[in-house]
Swiss-Prot record:
Gene (UniProt): groEL
Organism: Neisseria gonorrhoeae (strain NCCP11945)
Function: Together with its co-chaperonin GroES, plays an essential role in assisting protein folding. The GroEL-GroES system forms a nano-cage that allows encapsulation of the non-native substrate proteins and provides a physical environment optimized to promote and accelerate protein folding.
EC number: 5.6.1.7
Disulfide bonds: none
NCBIfam families: GroEL, PRK00013.1, PRK12849.1, PRK12850.1, PRK12851.1
Keywords for the protein's UniProt record, in alphabetical order: ATP-binding, Chaperone, Cytoplasm, Isomerase, Nucleotide-binding
Subcellular localization, as worded in the UniProt entry: Cytoplasm
Gene3D superfamilies named among the record's database cross-references: GroEL, GroEL-like equatorial domain, TCP-1-like chaperonin intermediate domain
Descriptive protein name: Chaperonin GroEL
Keyword Transmembrane helix annotated: no
Cellular component annotations (GO), alphabetically ordered: cytoplasm
PANTHER family: 60 KDA HEAT SHOCK PROTEIN, MITOCHONDRIAL
Subunit structure: Forms a cylinder of 14 subunits composed of two heptameric rings stacked back-to-back. Interacts with the co-chaperonin GroES.
């Protein structure tokens, strides 16, 4: 085991803060409508230009082990916020840097770090509650477009295309982002259902470029058990072969001889088939198979209801216009199911959502509604160069996450104003402990930092703007994009409440851990001995 470098106290904390500052200073320049670009060198291809905080954070690795630990902890803030809300990574980083900087002053002055952390936690809990109170629902297409635009660095075209996608596939539908072929952004909407299971063998692929198996006008066989014996399948395969159409088999599993025979038939061109595992587990799998059956107009072949694989006919099989099977996902497009039956099924699942007790069950049921009722929308990002395409795609993905978050928990005034207004909840928050009260003060000051940074990036004077915004009430704030003061929601500067909440909670969580750190341990790199020079080889003195 390699030797370790163990360091204690203020000295090591300062190194950690240095790491935090290096990473945060690189990320914070991207904040706001006038945020600057960061150019990242890549080992392959051209440099990557981005305004996405988490992309910048992920690229940073520092030489000093202790500074690097600080940087990695703040990177965690950005990543966690990105995972939960899909946006707000830069805001979270700016908040974390501010809480750490303020907190370190108090720790160095001799205050109890644990009490400071408790104070910070109490302040954040009060702010989160206040944010919930001031959030307003985000229902209209116009509001969705505004949220999308703000998240895509004030690109109105991106906001509009996301709002259109949500309108077409429903707020619960599947929306994906892909590289486009033209200079303009395009929206492609496909009515269909997507589930997270891919082909069981790469030999099923028939589109090498996209790495998918595409089936046009296929039959769909749904079976709730494993298929390992090809004899069980033969009667159905013969009927499908006579109809000269491809077949998708969705079963608990397809293995052994059955899978091998399907692959061989596919390679030889005898019968175009693809096998995938059924999505979900246990009772949820049965329910999802039933969903697919209703969508495609087929029947789930199950021994529980007296149906067997050997006696299955073409009438038992579902059908669709097209099915695309990738490595991890299968998309059923234009199933032949009866619209009335699909609606009845959706209504039935919505009923289950109302009676479900656990959040997990509700989430899974919600997903099933999305897959049945919605469709699949593909936003194709257009750009002149590959470098611009990557940058634009980052922003579109951010905007998509932000709009989903807005629909979920509502919106608040953007541009850092919501956090300033939520401060009102801290004015009268007294913990009865001087050190904890100091923790509350840390958060009170830190919530100004996002607005200060937005103004600084726009070339304004942060203190002047913050004071003027604090003099106002409600949604009154500063629009850095246009340089005007006014009603932020009226001007279309909105942030999803979920993004602001997640940024604050994750920033405070990691910053609190940093303040209570008193020892850091890093590995001492082993010094590799230099390779000695090769001495003159004997007996070769006469050679020039």
């Amino acid at each position: 085991m390699a030797a370790k470098d163990v360091q204690f106290g203020n000295e090591v904390r300062q190194k950690m803060v240095n790491g935090v500052n290096i990473l945060a200073n690189a990320v914070r320049v991207t904040l706001g409508p006038k945020g600057r670009n960061v150019v990242v060198d890549r080992a392959f291809g051209g440099p990557h230009i981005t305004k996405d905080g988490v992309t910048v954070a992920k690229e940073i690795e520092l030489k000093d082990k202790f500074e690097n630990m600080g940087a990695q902890m703040v990177k965690e803030v950005a990543s966690k916020t990105n995972d939960v809300a899909g946006d707000g990574t830069t805001t979270a980083t700016v908040l974390a840097q501010s809480i750490v900087a303020e907190g370190m002053k108090y720790v160095t002055a001799g205050m109890n770090p644990t009490d400071l952390k408790r104070g910070i936690d109490k302040a954040v809990a009060a702010l989160v509650e206040e944010l919930k109170n001031i959030a307003k629902p985000c229902d209209t297409s116009k509001e969705i477009a505004q949220v999308g635009s703000i998240s895509a660095n004030s690109d109105e075209q991106v906001g509009a295309i996301i709002a259109e996608a949500m309108e077409k596939v429903g707020k619960e539908g599947v929306i994906t982002v892909e590289d486009g072929k033209s200079l303009e952004n395009e929206l492609d909407v496909v009515e269909g259902m997507q589930f997270d299971r891919g082909y069981l063998s790469p030999y099923f692929i028939n589109d090498a470029e996209k790495q998918i198996a595409g089936l046009d006008n296929p039959f769909v066989l749904l079976f709730d058990k494993k298929i390992s014996n090809i004899r069980d399948l033969l009667p159905v395969l013969e009927q499908v072969a006579k109809a000269s159409r491809p077949l998708l088999i969705i079963a608990e599993d397809v293995e052994g001889e059955a899978l091998a025979t399907l692959v061989v038939n596919n390679i030889r061109g005898v019968l175009k088939t693809v096998a995938v595992k059924a999505p979900g587990f246990g009772d949820r799998r049965k329910a999802m198979l039933q969903d697919i059956a209703i969508l495609t107009g087929g029947v789930v072949i199950s021994e529980e209801v007296g149906l067997s694989l050997e006696k299955a006919t073409l009438d038992d099989l579902g059908q669709a216009k097209r099915i695309e099977i990738g490595k991890e996902n299968t998309t059923v497009i234009d199933g032949f199911g009866d619209a009335a039956q699909i609606e009845a099924r959706v209504a039935e699942i919505r009923q289950q959502i109302e009676t479900a007790t656990s959040d997990y069950d509700k989430e899974k049921l919600q997903e099933r509604v999305a897959k049945l009722a919605g469709g699949v929308a593909v936003i194709k990002v257009g750009a002149a160069t590959e470098v611009e395409m990557k940058e634009k795609k980052d922003r579109v993905e951010d905007a998509l996450h932000a709009t989903r978050a807005a629909v979920e928990e509502g919106v608040v005034a953007g541009g850092g104003v919501a956090l300033l207004r939520a401060r009102a909840a801290l004015e009268n928050l007294h913990t009865g402990n001087a050190d904890q009260d100091a923790g509350v003060q840390i958060v009170l000051r830190a919530v100004e930092s996002p607005l200060r940074q937005i103004v600084a990036n726009a070339g304004g004077e942060p203190s002047v703007v913050v004071n003027k915004v604090l003099e106002g009430k409600g949604n009154y704030g500063y629009n850095a994009g246009s340089g005007e003061y006014g009603d932020m929601i009226g001007m279309g500067v909105l942030d999803p409440a979920k993004v602001t909440r997640s940024a604050l909670q994750h920033a405070a969580s990691i910053a609190g851990l940093m303040l209570t750190t008193d020892c850091m341990i890093a590995e001492i790199p082993e010094e590799k001995p230099a390779v000695p020079d090769m001495g003159g080889m004997g007996g070769m003195g006469g050679m020039m």
